[in-house]
Amino acid sequence: MKKKIGLYWFTFDLRLHDNSLLVDASSFLDELVCLYCRPSVTPFLHHFAQEVTLGRARQKFIDASLCELNDALGQLGQRLWTLDLPPYQALKYAIQYLSVTHLYSDAMAGSDEQSILHKLQDEYPHLVIVQHSVRSLFDESKLPFTLPDLPETFTQFRKCVEGIDIAHPIDAPSRLPPMPKGAQLPTLSSFYFDESALFSGGEWSGLAHCRRYFFSGLASSYKETRNGLDGMAYSTKFSPWLALGCVSPRMIHAMLKQYEQTQGANDSTYWIYFELLWREYFYWYARCYQQRLFRFGGIRNQPPLTSFYAHRFQQWKNGTTPYPIVNACMHQLNHTGYMSNRGRQLVASCLVHELGLDWRYGAAYFETQLIDYDVGSNWGNWQYLAGVGADPRGSRQFNLEKQTQMYDPNHEFIERWQGRDSRAQQDVVDMVGWPITTQQENGDK
């Protein structure tokens, strides 16, 4: 009887707990290979973000998460193989080299990943592709609508799903099939732990953070503090580990319910669930709209009245705009890979309205920098702010001065992140709109 050789493609599901796909693979396969393809800056991303690599903080968080996953796999006699190739090439190589019969993959929200799986299925008709979501609160089969009929707004979605029972998270597999004999693929290189990082990536680190948060009692006051700009205590900070799948939303939901049973439920604990639903909506939003997630005109094909000005975009990225609160937020992002939810709304509003820029440039830059980058949440929320997405009220413009008075009245955040430091501000541009550097102004001496 032919061996069942499986390839598990880890993407945004970097964990063993609450991973039904991995449990299914462990009980069915004879041999297993676990593969991860490192993310890179695609031509599309390079065009809009104007970056050639991912931000340092994001890459470090990914590295730490991979190391923890590799250690966890090692305890079950497995290891994580990595290939520095585009995913399609990496998967194709592994399938051919190892004679893979079954490919396991999370039902990812991104259209690029879905396209890769379709191409592989066409090229290898014998290949059995097993796919289902391990990153969502709800199974697709439990949704009270088909995916093409996804509610047009979050409020409609919330009202549809709030009554659905959420499955309890399952345990990690107790065993995994062995690797194919003689298999030789690149493994993780040595990793330098960055003790200065704001967040430590990985499944164990993520679960520990969630437990600390609920143990602290902060969940009972979350709604009152959630609009803060700086610090660790004002919000849950679950998003970095949720984004890479180091922690499942069902695990957080189970912790939340346990907290409510022991400490009591209130508006704040409900609002944590509300935020999980917001994230859930944009997961299915990305699954539904696919390529329309990245179009200038959004899901309704209604392009906004914005354009692209290279010098303004560089000012925004570097935090040298005329708006101190925006500068402070961008400095925070560039240094830590993280920004508050309120900050993201302000810098997005500034890019679209004050600077008149195509929203996709901001969304793409966020993708390169954010340690909690999630395709649906990032691109869906940018569409929402730009008025080309799920918001029935159209684009949202924030009064930056008023927002500063509300959320940073003493300018402590602005001072800490040097929001008034615009010494690098470029107001002079060349013939194609790029900032002229001091060296260029001096004749490239």
Curated annotation (Swiss-Prot):
Binds 1 FAD per subunit. Residues 4-137 form the Photolyase/cryptochrome alpha/beta domain. One of its GO terms (biological process) is photoreactive repair. Pfam families: DNA_photolyase, FAD_binding_7. GO terms for molecular function: DNA binding; DNA photolyase activity; FAD binding. Its cofactor is FAD; (6R)-5,10-methylene-5,6,7,8-tetrahydrofolate. InterPro entries: Cry_DASH (IPR014133), Crypto/Photolyase_FAD-like_sf (IPR036134), Crypto/Photolyase_N_sf (IPR036155), Cryptochr/Photolyase_FAD-bd (IPR005101), Cryptochrome/DNA_photolyase_1 (IPR002081), DNA_photolyase_N (IPR006050), Rossmann-like_a/b/a_fold (IPR014729). Keywords: Chromophore, DNA-binding, FAD, Flavoprotein, Repressor, Transcription, Transcription regulation. It comes from the Bacteria. May have a photoreceptor function. Binds DNA; probably functions as a transcriptional repressor. Belongs to the DNA photolyase class-1 family. PANTHER family: CRYPTOCHROME, CRYPTOCHROME DASH. This is Cryptochrome DASH.
